[in-house]
Each structure stands twice: as structure tokens, then as C-alpha cells.
Amino acid sequence: MTLVLVNPHAKGGRVRHMLPAVRRVLDELAPLPRLHAPDTVQDALDLLMREPEGSRVVLVGGDGSVNRWLPALLTRQLHTGLVPLGSGNDLARALGLDRQHWPNALALALQGNTRPMDTGLAVWTDMHGDSHCTPFTSSLTAGFDSSVALRALQGPRWLSGLPRYLWATLRELQHLRHWTVRAQADGQHLDDGPVLLMSVLNTPTLGSGIAAMPHASTHDGQLDWLRAGPFGRLGCMHLLPRFLRGSHLTQPGVQVGRFKQLGLHCPQGIPLAADGEWLGLARQVQVHVQAHSLQMVTGNV
């Protein structure tokens, strides 16, 4: 029987109230899927790690849910369907799943064909010298957009999606900072100096639909890097609407590229987030692509 794993904390806890409706839909199916809504990340990981290798699971939640459960999905090589009920849903957007009503998305997640997608892996060192290993599906942000992600997580519950991200962006502009970063992509030295952000994308969007890297692909065997120089507040306000439209790539001070391996060094420590989930301050970051490492159900992409 297929495991359906619900994150009851997704969308500010509102997904918990949808459990009876999800159960009613599943009760009509044969064979009956197994429905679980674990309260902790560890409980969810334990459930996934007990699944037979290569079996199908369905996740109900958003980018953060997938990110927290990703280590088990990769280890067990699970074929994964996604019902996007999170605040951001940038992974679902890239897979063509974001416009479906949830019962239709659930039916597709249970029965749809899977396709291999790339993931990223970040090995990073925090300010205490401790090493961490973090996989991601959508984005690994460093700098301003990570600070925005943290502020968004702390934002008012009545805001969700893109409005919540824009609220956090405007609040973070009041505390604008820059970071001195040394970077290399596939052995090639990138520009040194202060940056507003130095981020990695696997999906075209981040932050609930901001088109940070419009041409990014989840299945091309590469990741995309995005560097923005030391823009001030006025420059950021000029850049923001272009980010929303995906027309920022040709702006002075913005650089992009593709890679398989990327290294970042920031002695002062740069804010880091994966799939919108806060990680901490990092001095060293090594990122590489894990090509075709996750089997995902896709929509019309």
C-alpha cells in the first residue's frame, strides 16, 4: 500500500485541518493507501526509511516538507508524488503541479508517471567549524535572500505565498547588508568582492514564484548560480520588480552561470537557506549537482 505522508505543520498549520478531507478521498481508493501525519521530522524520516527501496510515496506539503524529508527519499530511492499544500511551492511550480486542485494533485501523485530530476547537495561549515550536509531540490540561497527566508518564516501567519515573501523582503531592506565572497564554479574563479546574494537555483523560481532563474531546469544535469553585487536600497527596489518578471539577468551587477560544482568562501559568515528553510551562517560552502537522483511525478511540463 502506498504511503501518503502529510506535514500537519505546512501552510502555517492549516494542512492539519485538511486531514479529514484527505482521508475521505483516500477511503474511496483500492487498495487503500496508508495515511500518516507525523508531528516531527524524525518521525517522518523513520516512516520513509522503512519503505521498500524504489516504492512510491506521496508527500502532502510544500518545499520545506520535501526538503526536510529529502534525505530519506534519496537514500531509499523512493518514487515521489507531491500534493503542493505549502506556502512557497516552487518545486511544484517547476514540475507543473502548482495549478491543480488538491484532490486532482493527489490522484496524479498516486498514479502518475515519474521522471528523474536533479537535486543539489551542499556541504557547509558553520561559524563553529562544524560541518553539515544538506540536500535540496529547488534552491540554496546565500546572502540577502536567505535573510529574507528567515524573516518570512517568522512573519505573520495570515500572510502566505508571494505576499509573505514580499513583506519579508521589504522588512529586510531596512537592515541591508553585503558579504565578501570568494567563489569558484567548476574550477573557474568568479568575481571576488561584496555581494547582495550568491545563490544556487535548480528551479526557475524561489520565494513563492519569484523568477530568479527563468531558464533553470530540474533535469539538465546542472545547477545555476546567481550573483548580485552590492546593490543599495534604491538599487534593490529597482531590481525587485525585475526579479518578479524574470527580466533582471541582463542588469549591471547581476551575473549568472551554470555549474556542476561550486565553492563559496565567506570568512564573516553568510546567511544560508535551502528550499526556503533557514540553515545558519556559513563560512565555507561546497555545492554539487546530483544528476537524475530523485524520481518525481510531474504534471504538464
Segments from the language model and where they lie:
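ATP/NTP phosphate-donor binding region
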Residues: 1-60, 67, 71, 75, ...
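Catalytic core of DAGKc-family lipid kinases
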Residues: 3, 38, 74-79, 85-196
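ATP/nucleoside-binding phosphotransfer catalytic cores, i.e., glycine-rich phosphate-binding loops
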Residues: 15, 185, 217-218, 223, ...
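Short glycine-/acidic-enriched loop or helix-start segments at secondary-structure transitions
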Residues: 15, 68-71, 92-94, 209-210, ...
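Glycine-rich phosphate/pyrophosphate-binding beta-alpha loops
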Residues: 141, 145, 199-213, 278
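Short acidic/glycine-rich loop or secondary-structure boundary segments that cap or lie
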Residues: 145-148, 191-193, 205-209, 233-236
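Short Gly/aromatic-enriched secondary-structure transition segments
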Residues: 152, 213-216
